[in-house]
């Protein structure tokens, strides 16, 4: 892996110099390697949504730098434009991104603006609509006739079709029922496995972060509170709870067991890890 995205001492202040001045992001630095799957978590107001809008130049930082493949995205208009193709952003509410007359035209919008030929655009539209489970007969429909879940699929397909180097997904499961969440989870994992794209998955749900991420960044009051593997982050579960964040249900159970004197490791975050620990505790084999 090599570094594809680098954030260096980034701060963002809204309404500078006014009575409403507010620092939303405070001196944040981190980098993302090519192919990494990163969960970015934090409670409402932690600064995560403001932060991600800098990655492709939608917001300009009050101070600090954003680099894509070693290039400052604000060094020129050309670099800022290139960043918008290199970093795909799916907002929490897909209706913010859908505007064309048909699903096909909406998914094709990004590839068309990249200057791709018609055959390549058509391939990308159809392939990525298939990945997100949209049938051919939907392509000629207006996206505004679709259900919320289908709109989410169209928004994902539109970003997938651009084949960005970095994909940022802001609460992609928000508002979906359990079946819809499972579908979106599967689409994202399939795309990641096929393309090796760097993915930053923004969520307030520790359950989703634990299931999907190989690395978790925790934000609190505009700065990074934690950055590590899921095991490293959930080993500090009590700090997470103090910061107003939840932890996976299985982690919470093991925290309670430890408080009651049971010799368990409360950093578990999957059912499989919990079962293995309980088997060891009983003197059994964790592989049984």
Model-derived regions, located:
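Helix-to-loop junction immediately C-terminal to a conserved catalytic motif
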Residues: 56
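Conserved ABC ATPase "signature" region
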Residues: 120-137
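Conserved ABC ATPase signature
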Residues: 142-146, 150
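ABC ATPase NBD Q-loop/coupling interface
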Residues: 65-82
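Conserved catalytic motifs of ABC-family nucleotide-binding domains
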Residues: 163
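The feature captures the beta-strand-to-loop junction immediately N-terminal to the Walker
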Residues: 41-43
């Amino acid at each position: 892996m090599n570094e594809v995205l680098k954030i260096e001492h980034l701060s963002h202040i809204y309404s500078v110099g006014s009575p409403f001045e507010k620092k939303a992001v405070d001196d944040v630095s981190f980098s993302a390697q090519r192919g990494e799957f990163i969960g970015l978590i934090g409670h409402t107001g932690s600064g995560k949504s403001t932060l991600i809008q800098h990655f492709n130049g939608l917001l300009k930082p009050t101070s600090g730098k954003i680099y894509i493949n070693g290039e400052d995205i604000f060094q020129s208009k050309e670099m800022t434009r290139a960043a918008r193709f290199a970093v795909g952003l799916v907002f929490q509410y897909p209706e913010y991104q859908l505007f064309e007359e048909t699903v096909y035209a909406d998914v094709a919008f990004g590839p068309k603006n990249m200057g791709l030929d018609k055959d390549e655009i058509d391939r990308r539209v159809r392939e990525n609509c298939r990945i997100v489970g949209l049938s051919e007969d939907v392509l000629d429909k207006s996206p505004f006739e679709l259900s919320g879940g289908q709109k989410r699929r169209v928004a994902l397909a539109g970003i997938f079709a651009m084949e960005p180097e970095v994909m940022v997904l802001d609460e992609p499961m928000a508002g979906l029922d359990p079946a819809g969440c499972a579908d979106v989870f599967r689409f994202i994992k399939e795309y990641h496995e096929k393309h090796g794209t760097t993915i930053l998955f923004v969520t307030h749900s520790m359950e989703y972060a634990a299931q999907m991420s190989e690395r978790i960044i925790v934000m609190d009051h505009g700065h990074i509170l934690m950055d590590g593997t899921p095991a490293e982050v959930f080993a500090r579960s009590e700090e997470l709870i103090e910061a107003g964040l939840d932890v996976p249900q299985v982690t919470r159970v093991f925290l309670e067991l430890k408080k009651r004197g049971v010799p368990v490791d409360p950093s578990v975050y999957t059912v499989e890890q919990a079962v293995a620990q309980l088997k060891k505790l009983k003197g059994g084999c964790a592989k049984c």
